[in-house]
Amino acid sequence: MCSCMEYDKMKEEVNVPLLEKDTCIENIEQTEGYEMKYAVSSCLLGVNCKYNGGNNASPELIEYLKEHEVLQVCPEVLGGLPVPRACAELSGDNIMNTEGEDVTAQFERGAALALAQIREFQPDLVILQPRSPSCGKGIIYDGGFHNQLVEGNGILVRLLLHEGIPVMTCGEFLEEVKRLSTKG
């Protein structure tokens, strides 16, 4: 997959400048009138960009984000993969699809391009689709195409975390919204 050295090389290839903004979620200043900005997996917003041509629309997330500035990102499409496309999973250090093709280069390019867009937009938080080889955070499919989950992060999440950019899955975000709304 993408080591820090490979990451630095990818940054050079797509001309991504160094991150200057402190984006740790603990340091996000919540002041009256401040509206948070979000970068969000396109599929969560109803865009048909999943491998099977569908989406993972989250009506609750879409409703919440109506009042916020949002950047939609799909690293797989940015990397040149078509819609629909063969299902892909992380397999060791590579991303393989169900047709046996190594699509690591497309995923790495898409992740680097998504990172560049995200950094330019400067969101307070990135909300991504769980389990994906690009966007999965904490748990991803194991690469055997048997619906088995393992601990790990997708390639875009690895880059974002390396940069210190806060990331949540859709489920984590909605749980936090629910927790905060019942708190106050």
Language model regions located:
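Short, positively charged and aromatic/hydrophobic N-terminal segments
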Residues: 7-9, 23-32
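Divalent-metal-activated hydrolytic enzyme cores
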Residues: 2, 24, 33, 78, ...
